[in-house]
């Protein structure tokens, strides 16, 4: 295609490192990572890229989002031996091949050392909740319906306890073949935003997250909001390092990867 040219230079000198910012609706995907269980964001994007570039590529992502989780600002990269001279045309061509629930928002040439995971300094996730008795159908695929009164003041108090550096073992689900060297993570900020139609957005920003940590924090905040847990329970939950002490895991469909910071 006319926006790429095959270089005559050696592989090491001709390799370009391309960073993509992508957004996707997670409903149809079994998460970011390739899996025999069903379609993944990674495989869908890889297939379209290889169709354009005409060579095998490997993708790395800032976050391996779970099945059903959405993204507004996922960052991925790939190496190519093609010289992509017109990034805007490249984006248009790639989007024309991709399903409409997966979009390329931007593309950028990066230094060879750039890695979307290793160079990431923080990620921000947004989780949406509707606590009205009846949820509008348009919100159903993208927010957790909790049709009961919530004590927002108590939830805000709990947030202040969770911010900072802690051992978040109690907020980590077990995952086969995933072993952490430690469970200490730093939550930089949590904001509770009240939206229209009795909806909430919980924004959580941190340097790194454990498996399902964000969704378990949200589930715990909901338990506090409905009075099933108390604000005073948070320190003992953290100290327990016991997943059963914290709240329920919030469902995947309310979660968005919002921003990745470098």
From Swiss-Prot:
Coiled coil: none annotated. InterPro entries: PsdUridine_synth_cat_dom_sf, PsdUridine_synth_TruA, PsdUridine_synth_TruA_a/b_dom, PsdUridine_synth_TruA_C, TruA/RsuA/RluB/E/F_N. It catalyses: uridine(38/39/40) in tRNA = pseudouridine(38/39/40) in tRNA. Substrate binds at residue 125. Gene3D superfamilies: Pseudouridine synthase I, catalytic domain, C-terminal subdomain (3.30.70.660), Pseudouridine synthase I, catalytic domain, N-terminal subdomain (3.30.70.580). Its EC number is 5.4.99.12. NCBIfam families: hisT_truA. PANTHER family: PSEUDOURIDYLATE SYNTHASE (PTHR11142), TRNA PSEUDOURIDINE SYNTHASE-LIKE 1 (PTHR11142:SF0). This is tRNA pseudouridine synthase A 2. The lineage of its organism: Bacteria, Pseudomonadati, Chlamydiota, Chlamydiia, Parachlamydiales.
């Amino acid at each position: 295609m006319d926006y790429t040219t095959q270089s005559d230079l050696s592989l090491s000198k001709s390799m370009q490192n391309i960073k993509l910012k992508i957004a996707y609706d997670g409903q149809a995907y079994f998460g970011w990572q390739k899996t025999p269980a069903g379609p993944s964001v990674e495989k869908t994007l890889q297939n379209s890229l290889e169709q354009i570039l005409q060579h095998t590529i490997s993708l790395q992502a800032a976050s391996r989002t779970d099945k059903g989780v959405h993204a507004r600002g996922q960052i991925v990269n790939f190496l190519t031996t093609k010289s992509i001279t017109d990034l805007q045309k490249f984006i248009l061509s790639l989007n024309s091949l991709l399903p409409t629930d997966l979009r390329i928002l931007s593309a950028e040439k990066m230094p060879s050392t750039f890695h979307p995971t290793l160079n990431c300094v923080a990620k921000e996730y947004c989780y949406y909740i509707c606590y009205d008795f009846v949820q509008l159908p348009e919100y159903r695929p993208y927010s957790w319906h909790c049709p009961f009164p919530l004590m927002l003041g108590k939830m805000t108090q709990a947030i202040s306890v969770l911010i900072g550096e802690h051992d978040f073992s109690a907020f980590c689900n077990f995952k086969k073949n995933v072993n952490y060297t430690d469970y200490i993570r730093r939550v930089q900020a949590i904001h509770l935003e009240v939206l229209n139609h009795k909806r909430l957005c919980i924004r959580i920003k941190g340097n790194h997250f454990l498996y399902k940590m964000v969704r378990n924090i949200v589930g715990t905040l909901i338990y506090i909001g409905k009075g099933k847990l108390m604000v005073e329970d948070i320190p003992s939950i953290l100290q327990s390092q016991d997943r059963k002490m914290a709240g329920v895991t919030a469902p995947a469909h309310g979660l968005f990867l919002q921003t990745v910071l470098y």
